[in-house]
A protein has these predicted regions:
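Bulky hydrophobic segments
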Residues: 19-214, 233-379
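Alpha-helical segment that forms one wall of the substrate-binding/catalytic cleft
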Residues: 224, 228, 232-234
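Divalent metal-coordination and catalytic microenvironments
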Residues: 197, 221, 227
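Bacterial N-terminal signal peptides that target proteins for export
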Residues: 1-9
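Bacterial N-terminal signal peptides
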Residues: 8-17
Length: 379
């Protein structure tokens, strides 16, 4: 509770300049298991945005990771990966390839990496930010046309990604409509994140020739994405998304607050947790991008999640979920991510027509069985 108060006060100071006087303070994350927040009105919001340009370079599970290229070790190069809640820098809505390049070169004002929390396990900050951005983007598309049939086309990830929204009659109350649009946007953004894990396992490569299999179904990934969806919805519902600039500054404030609420620890303690799992969840003797540097994966794709259980953690985990229903509307009846056959599907079987979230468990179960077989052969 002290951390919540502390970060509410810090948020007030951060956002009190006249430039951002339209922001209502304080910003407090809603980390109840099921979201409780509702909009009190239809707030001013961003105009229709460009889709996020790719994803931030995220972290393989572990720290001080060695790297190799074409099977040859890269000398004197290590990936630290560990960050702290109070050292995450700024947030920038990721609609430019320059942002990803800056992250790769280590010159970004954003700090991304992994940290450990008592209630949320390991959190990947890049995944939090990416799904927060996707939620804002989808809200900018969904809110102006809520209830109308539309298709939002995203870039390919093995499959053509189409977000199909169905026609329906929205609530008459404006605040209820606004709330429904925010939660529908977070619901769809999480489906986009879940598909990314599947696509990585089946051969998707952001950079051709560089396998991303090491990152597929990493134990912290989808809980981190879910956290990002929840935080973005919280900001939208509190009126903190009237512009990209306002959203960026609000994310800069809410993210550390949420991490402290989850029980974020120091970088030293995060590294200790990694050390305790070395040989079980990851293999410090392997190098990026070897797939089985990561030994533990979480193949569940639901948006009702607990953190992947840490054997040594006695503190209760925090379950988070997205609303499956709001104001009498079932989210699954309002829209879905459709994955149509793409130009290069690698190991992904071609769908009869398209995949949806209903197919995710079977695709993930196949991945789990294949990985288990390969790990058994390695022992």
């Amino acid at each position: 509770m002290l951390n919540v108060v502390k970060y509410g006060l810090i948020t007030g100071i951060l956002l009190s300049s006249s430039c951002f006087s339209q922001i209502k303070l304080p910003i407090v994350p809603d980390l109840s298991t099921s979201p409780l927040q509702q909009a009190t009105r239809a707030w001013p919001t961003v105009e229709m945005l460009s889709a996020p340009d790719g994803l931030r370079p995220c972290c393989a599970f572990g720290y001080n990771l060695k790297a190799q290229a074409l099977g040859i070790p890269v000398p004197l190069y290590q990936l630290n990966n560990v960050v702290e809640a109070d050292g995450l820098g700024e947030h920038h809505y990721n609609d430019s390839l320059l942002g990803a390049v800056a992250n790769l070169m280590g010159i970004s004002s954003e700090q991304d990496g992994l940290l450990y929390t008592a209630h949320g396990g390991f959190i990947d900050i890049a995944h939090v930010r990416d799904t927060a951005d996707m939620t804002l983007f989808l809200f900018s598309q969904i809110w102006p046309r809520l209830g109308q049939e539309q298709t939002i086309v995203l870039s390919e990830e093995l499959a053509q990604r189409h977000i199909q929204l169905f026609a329906f009659t929205p609530p008459q109350n404006e605040a209820e409509r606004f709330t429904l649009a925010a939660y529908l946007s977070s619901y769809m953004a999480f489906q986009v994140a879940a598909w990314h894990e599947i696509a990585q396992w089946y051969g998707f490569e952001s950079v051709p020739g560089f396998s991303e299999g090491i990152s597929a179904f990493s134990p912290e990934d989808l809980y981190s994405n879910l956290l990002g969806a929840r935080l973005a919805a919280s900001l939208i519902l509190q009126g903190h998304s009237s512009s990209v600039e306002q959203f960026n500054l609000s994310m800069q404030a809410i993210l550390p607050a949420a991490l402290h609420q989850l029980g974020a620890v120091s970088a030293k303690d995060t590294r200790f947790q990694f050390d305790m799992l070395d040989g079980n969840w990851w293999d410090s003797h392997r190098a990026v991008p070897e797939k089985f540097l990561v030994l533990k994966r979480n193949y569940l794709t639901d948006d009702d999640r607990i953190p992947t259980p840490i054997p040594s953690e006695s503190t209760a985990s925090l379950r988070l979920r997205l609303p499956a229903e709001w104001a009498g509307f079932q989210m699954k009846d309002l829209g879905e991510l459709r994955l149509l056959s793409g130009r290069s599907m690698k190991q992904l079987p071609k769908p009869d027509e398209y995949y949806t979230f209903r197919d995710f468990p079977a695709l993930a179960l196949h991945a789990r069985a294949e990985d288990a077989g390969q790990l058994a052969e390695m022992k």
